[in-house]
């Protein structure tokens, strides 16, 4: 395999080309990209955990250091001012020397407010990209050049097309997340609480809670019906029914986002439903290809949900077509089939149809779908269908003309299990779809 250093060199060349095009289109001389700053908790003297500007980590795998600055013009070697204070209160990251530093000019920045004297004197034509607009104004950046929408739209659109370096990083993130999922399943099988399962996951991935790309969803039993459940009970339930784990990892700033669901017993209806959702998810991925709208795959999976609702007699005496047409599948899968993935978990540009930022909203029937793009080579997306038993969504169907088609007794029996979600991360190639998750043999 090609080394990360050579892949990174090509990655920088791609970013330089995109930058040249963006600067020419919007008549700017350079972009000043800010890693971000620490922000203190209200009325306190300690900061919130630092989260780096994703446009910054697109260029350099520096994810834990605030007060850094990148100056890029698409022609000259990118210039990185790396924050290196004299500080005996806090850990100070050393000046980096790694696979990527040959392609970036790295300069120590001893004082957070010292960047002003190091930048070009003429700044009227420099664009600022970062989370602290007031800092840009202090540096003399024109207000109209602070996070300019056209530039961001352009950069975001092309972030959809991953370089080989980015794909290599995402495959490494997959490996870490897969290790975590295996450790978490073992912890579940041994009867641990959600809190302790989460610790097992973090230990296996080598992450802290603040390192993972999103808060882990560690849901036992009925908690699996809460789509973004992050509470973490300290006490294990008296009886284990099910375990849904939605948890990822990060490598060089790039995310993995995986979900698996397990039944405590292998011989009940729920266990068979888990298997069937898994099989249908794999069957959908097998149909995916470049040139097709992501929306089409979402709609297709509602048809697959209808098939499972009928097979398991959760909905009765109704055709699968009628279920989808009348949205009886909606309360069982209330979220989208997935989303773009990359530097951010819900990566940017899911609705952008071109590099001018033309927006195509999700269909009115499926408002929570996060992507309406035509699939193209280089895109990375999640495929994460589910079936849930959520009372607040089912309640409106308990009355009315369709109520008789719901097998309420079966639904009540399944509610203690919460729900099911199966999520893989896939790469669209010209002639195939790579399933990074299954390639690592995560069942």
Curated annotation (Swiss-Prot):
Cofactor note: Binds 2 manganese ions per subunit.
Domain of life: Bacteria
GO biological process: proteolysis
Pfam families: PepQ_N, Peptidase_M24
Positions of transmembrane segments: none
Family annotation (InterPro entries): Creatin/AminoP/Spt16_N (IPR029149), Creatinase/aminopeptidase-like (IPR036005), PepQ_N (IPR048819), Pept_M24 (IPR000994), Peptidase_M24B_aminopep-P_CS (IPR001131), X-Pro_dipept-like (IPR052433), X_Pro_dipept (IPR022846)
Known catalytic reactions: Xaa-L-Pro dipeptide + H2O = an L-alpha-amino acid + L-proline
UniProt binding sites for Mn(2+) 2: 246, 257, 423
UniProt-listed Enzyme Commission number(s): 3.4.13.9
One Gene Ontology molecular-function label: aminopeptidase activity
Cofactor(s) needed: Mn(2+)
Binding site for Mn(2+) 1: 257, 339, 384, 423
Enzyme class: hydrolase
Alphabetical keyword list: Dipeptidase, Hydrolase, Manganese, Metal-binding, Metalloprotease, Protease
Coiled coil: none
A GO CC term assigned to this protein in UniProt: cytosol
Role according to the record: Splits dipeptides with a prolyl residue in the C-terminal position.
PANTHER family: XAA-PRO AMINOPEPTIDASE 3, XAA-PRO DIPEPTIDASE
Record family assignment: Belongs to the peptidase M24B family. Bacterial-type prolidase subfamily.
Protein name as annotated: Xaa-Pro dipeptidase
Native source organism of the sequence: Escherichia coli (strain SE11)
